Amino acid sequence: VIVDNKAGASGTIGGKAVQTSPADGNTLLFSAATHVLAKQVLATPPYDPVTDFTAVARTGEAPLLIVIPPTAPQKNLREVIDAAKGGNNWNAAIPALGAPSHLATLLLAKQGNVKITMTPYRGTAPALADVAGGHVQVLMDSIISLQGMARAGKVKPIAVTSTQRSGVAPDVPTAVESGFPGMVYNSWYGVWAPKGTPPDRVLALNKAINKATAGLARAGAFTALGILPVLESTEQFRQFVAKDVARSAELLKEAGFKAE
């Protein structure tokens, strides 16, 4: 397996490379949930992320970690929402438009019935640095990306967005525990092939990826990162994507988001 990291433009640079590859199952796209929202967040997306690809397999999902500056006086998510309602100008760092961090922040504003200004960044690293420095009030992103800084005390973790506490951050309560029952949002990861890839090839890839995922899960590789392994058929993956896109599109519409 040759890995070619093609980042940028909300994931569409790598996506375009795969979309225009031969539909033989030899070139695949591995991406986070950001991939399926290109049509919603980009004014001129280079493709339709759902109809121009063949869903192969979903491999895992991980909760988002909500962090605030280490010097912030708030101790939990409820206090953060109350402070935001108190007339303070609260800014949330957004590492990428259409990413789980963006959609989860919209969901938090909805669940908390509060206005939060979205501040876009070019990736998680600069967003995390500004939260650590107290320049931005809140950030949520995959627990994989934020847990290192949280453990080091560079940022203060206040909640995770899963239904249960994460094994890699057992002392951090869920947003549900903090009084926000609808604040459940996971980042997820999947594999796609170009449209037109033969069904038998897609099925073989799905079985192989599920087998590899199960093996990594048994070895503890997923648990160590806070990822929950997912073993699904291609049809289950397609149905999941349809529901996720609908949910995200609704959040963007309610927020008055305009594609850029």
Task: Give names to the regions the model predicted.
Residues 10, 14, 33, 37, ...:
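Stable alpha-helical elements in mature extracytoplasmic
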Residues 110-111, 177, 199-260:
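An extracytoplasmic/periplasmic, membrane-proximal ligand-sensing/linker region
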Residues 1-51, 88-91, 97, 110-142, ...:
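N-terminal (or domain-start) structured segment
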Residues 32-34, 72, 96-98, 161-164:
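Short, flexible active-site-adjacent loop segments at beta-strand->alpha-helix junctions, enriched
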Residues 34-44, 107-111, 138-172:
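A ligand-binding cleft/hinge motif common to bilobed small-molecule-binding domains
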